[in-house]
Amino acid sequence: GGAFAYVGAMQDSFPHALELSKKGYNAFALIYRPGAQTACEDLARAIRFIFDHAGELEVDTDCYSLWGGSAGARMAAWLGSYGAEAFGGGNLPRPGAVIMQYTGLSEYSESDPPTYACVGDRDGIANWRVMQARLEAMQQAGIDTEFHVYSGLGHGFGLGTGTSAEGWINDAVA
C-alpha cells in the first residue's frame, strides 16, 4: 500500500509475508517504485524473476497468488486481470488467486482469478460498498469471490491482530 506515493511495507507486506511463511508458503514482499504503472511493472518483473529463478529459490510457481493492501491490492488485481505481459513481465501464467485488502477498485475483467477481499467498515479511503459491488459483479460473471467487512476498522489494519479482523489471513488461505 501507500497510494502509489510510498510503500507501506512495514504495515502490510512484511508482516503478511512472515505470517504466510509461518504457514509453510513461500512469500515475497515487494518494494516498488511510486506510480501505478511503474509499480505494476515492478511487480511483473518480480514475478518474472521468481519464475526464472524458481529452482534456485526453491519455490513452486504453480498456482501462485498475489496479495496486496490499498495500492498493493490494485497492483495485485491489475496483474490478475491483465497478466504480467501487460506490464512488461513477459508471457507468464496469471495468478491462481488475488487477495486484496482495503481498496476502492471497481474495475475487473472476466478473466480475473478467484478473489478474496476484506475491508473495514470505517475505512475513510476505500469504501467497503465499492469493494462489495466489485466482488458481486465478479460473482455474477462466474468468478469465485469471498468478501469480508470488519466492524470498527479503518484503512490499513494489516494482520488485524487484536481487532475484529484477527484471523482474516486464515480465511484467505483456506
Model regions: which residues?
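Short amphipathic alpha-helix adjacent to the substrate-entry channel of hydrolases
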Residues: A9-F28, L135-E136
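Active-site glycine-rich loops that stabilize anionic/oxyanionic intermediates
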Residues: G1-A5, S70, D121
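Primarily recognizes the serine-hydrolase "nucleophile elbow" in alpha/beta-hydrolase
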Residues: E41-D112
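A fold-wide structural signal in alpha/beta-hydrolase
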Residues: S21-I31, S65, A97, D144-E146
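Short alpha-helix in the alpha/beta-hydrolase fold that links the catalytic acid
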Residues: P113, N127-A137
